[in-house]
């Protein structure tokens, strides 16, 4: 039985490095694609809570994954709530209800109060 021809190894799944093209004559240099994350915001909150504490890149990756997961859960639940009520817009009310449904007890209360505070601050600054 003939062996199949081996091709170049495929890049690992979840690889974060941007693929750069070799520069051709007359072409402009290609920029690396930006990878969005919540790391700067996680770092700012960490410094507010514990100014003398650092965070490893692995821990930051976990925190980024956590924030993305919670965001998707809240957005999904808010979307479902809007659909149930035959609405085409997700308002702060849907977000608040989604948070109450997803987060347990005291955590939900704190999240709702912080969210209300943030919305009030935003509307007053407009």
From Swiss-Prot:
Region (Disordered): 1-35
PTM section of the record: Monoubiquitination of Lys-121 by the BRE1 gives a specific tag for epigenetic transcriptional activation and is also prerequisite for histone H3 'Lys-4' and 'Lys-79' methylation. Phosphorylated on Ser-15 during apoptosis; which facilitates apoptotic chromatin condensation.
Annotated keywords: Acetylation, Chromosome, DNA-binding, Glycoprotein, Isopeptide bond, Nucleosome core, Nucleus, Phosphoprotein, Ubl conjugation
Sequence positions bearing N6-acetyllysine: 6, 13, 16, 21
Position of the Glycyl lysine isopeptide (Lys-Gly) (interchain with G-Cter in ubiquitin) cross-link: 121
Protein origin, superkingdom: Eukaryota
Record flagged with keyword Ubl conjugation: yes
Family annotation (Pfam families): Histone
Any Gene Ontology CC annotation: nucleosome
Presence of the UniProt keyword Protein biosynthesis in the record: no
Residues modified to Phosphoserine: 15
Subcellular location(s) of the protein: Nucleus; Chromosome
Function in brief: Core component of nucleosome. Nucleosomes wrap and compact DNA into chromatin, limiting DNA accessibility to the cellular machineries which require DNA as a template. Histones thereby play a central role in transcription regulation, DNA repair, DNA replication and chromosomal stability. DNA accessibility is regulated via a complex set of post-translational modifications of histones, also called histone code, and nucleosome remodeling.
Subunit-structure text: The nucleosome is a histone octamer containing two molecules each of H2A, H2B, H3 and H4 assembled in one H3-H4 heterotetramer and two H2A-H2B heterodimers. The octamer wraps approximately 147 bp of DNA.
Family, as annotated: Belongs to the histone H2B family.
Protein name, as recorded: Histone H2B 5
Species per Swiss-Prot/TrEMBL record: Gallus gallus
The organism's taxonomic lineage, starting at the top: Eukaryota, Metazoa, Chordata, Craniata, Vertebrata
């Amino acid at each position: 039985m003939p062996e199949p021809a081996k091709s170049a190894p495929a890049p690992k799944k979840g690889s974060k490095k941007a693929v750069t093209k070799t520069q051709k004559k007359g072409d402009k240099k290609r920029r690396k694609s930006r990878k969005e994350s919540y790391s700067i915001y996680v770092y700012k909150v960490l410094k507010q809570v514990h100014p003398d504490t650092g965070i490893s890149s692995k821990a930051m990756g976990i925190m980024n994954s956590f924030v993305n997961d919670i965001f998707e859960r809240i957005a999904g639940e808010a979307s479902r709530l809007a659909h149930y009520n035959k609405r085409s817009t997700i308002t702060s009310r849907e977000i608040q209800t989604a948070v109450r449904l997803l987060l347990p007890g005291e955590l939900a209360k704190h999240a709702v109060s912080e969210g209300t505070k943030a919305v009030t601050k935003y509307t007053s600054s407009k």
